[in-house]
Amino acid sequence: MIFVITVLSGGTGTPKLLQGLKRVVNNEELAVIVNTGEDTWIGDLYLSPDVDTVLYTLADLINEETWYGVKEDTFYTHEQLKNLGFDEVLRIGDKDRALKMHKTYYLKRGHKLSEVVDMEKVALGIKAKVIPMTDDRVETKILAKVDGKVDLLKFHDFWVKRKGDVEVLDVIYENSLYAKPCEKAVEAIKNSDLVIIGPSNPITSIGPILSLNGIKELLKDKKVVVVSPIVGNSAVSGPAGKLMKAKGYDVSVKGIYEFYKDIVDVLVIDNVDKEIAKEIPCEVLITNTIMKTLDDKVRLAKNIIEFCGSL
C-alpha cells in the first residue's frame, strides 16, 4: 500500500498533477520538494517562483492561464514601477507581491527559506508539506551564444526576457556542489512509500534538485516514478526540448529515461508513445498524460498510485 508520497516539482507541468493528487490522497501524507534554482532578487524583493506556484496550486489560488501568480490578480504596482523607470523582469501581481514581500521580510531577518515557506503554507491553509530543495543559494544559469558571443544567462533572462531565443550550449547549477538539501526534504524522501518526479522540465526544474549532495543516493533506495514531460518528440510546455538537446539527450521518452535511468523504477508515458514502451528498460505505465481538465489530473494521479501500488 502507498500511504506517504513525496513529489519533486518545478513550476510548470507538475503543479497540474498536484491538483489531481491533492484530491485523491491524504494531504497530510503528501510532501512536495520544490526547485529553487530559479530563485532571484528583483530590486529588494526575493522571488521564489516555483515555490510560490506550488503554494498557490495547493491553495487553489493559482492563475491557470499562466501557471504563475494568483488568479484574478491586479498589476497596479508593477505598472507604476514601470512608469517610474524600474522594469521588473517578471510581471508581478499585487497579491503575489505580498507573498514575496513576506518572504523578503523574514529572509532579511535571518530566517531560513524553508521556515518562511512553512509559515506561508500554514497561512494559506495547505495541509501538504511544501519544502524548498535547499536553504542555500543555488542558481540555474544558461550558457548560451548571444549575438555571436558566449554569455552566462540567468534563467529568467533566458526564458522571460529573451523568450529562449538563443543557442544553448550548456546548463549550470551554480553552487550546487556546496549546497545542502533541506533537512525536511531528506526526511520526506526517507519516509516516503513513493516518490513521484512530476512532468516538469528535467533540466532546469528537476535537475537542480537531483544535483544536491545525497539526493540521488536517497532516491536509489525508494520506489521512484517519473512522469514524462515529453509527448511524441516535443515538450508539453516550456523549453525542456531545447535544454535536453543542449545536455545531449534525445527529445523523446527514451531521452527522459536516459536522464533518470539511475533512479527511475516506473516511467509514465502518454498513449502517443505506446510503441516505444518496449524499448524502455524499466516498468512503464501507458496512459493519458495530457492534463487539460481537473478530471484528467485526478485520473492521472489515481492511475499512478494504483499502478505503483500493485508493483
Swiss-Prot record:
Q: What is this protein called?
A: 2-phospho-L-lactate transferase
Species of provenance = Methanocaldococcus jannaschii (strain ATCC 43067 / DSM 2661 / JAL-1 / JCM 10045 / NBRC 100440)
Report the family membership: Belongs to the CofD family.
Q: Which gene encodes it?
A: cofD
Q: How does activity depend on temperature?
A: Optimum temperature is about 37 degrees Celsius. Thermostable. Still fully active after heating at 80 degrees Celsius for 24 hours. Activity begins to decrease after heating at 98 degrees Celsius for 30 minutes. Inactive after heating at 110 degrees Celsius for 30 minutes.
* Signal peptide residues on this chain, from the entry's feature table: none
Listed under catalytic activity are: (2S)-lactyl-2-diphospho-5'-guanosine + 7,8-didemethyl-8-hydroxy-5-deazariboflavin = oxidized coenzyme F420-0 + GMP + H(+)
Pathway it belongs to?
Answer: Cofactor biosynthesis; coenzyme F420 biosynthesis
Q: How is its activity regulated?
A: Inhibited by EDTA in vitro.
Q: Which InterPro entries match?
A: CofD, CofD-like_dom_sf, FbiA/CofD
Name any Gene Ontology BP term.
F420-0 metabolic process
Q: What does this protein do?
A: Catalyzes the transfer of the 2-phospholactate moiety from (2S)-lactyl-2-diphospho-5'-guanosine to 7,8-didemethyl-8-hydroxy-5-deazariboflavin (FO) with the formation of oxidized coenzyme F420-0 and GMP.
UniProt xrefs under HAMAP family = CofD
- Give the keywords, sorted: Magnesium, Transferase
Instruction: Mention one GO molecular function.
Output: magnesium ion binding
What does the subunit comment say?
Answer: Homodimer.
**Magnesium among keywords:** yes
Among SUPFAM superfamilies, the record links this protein to: CofD-like
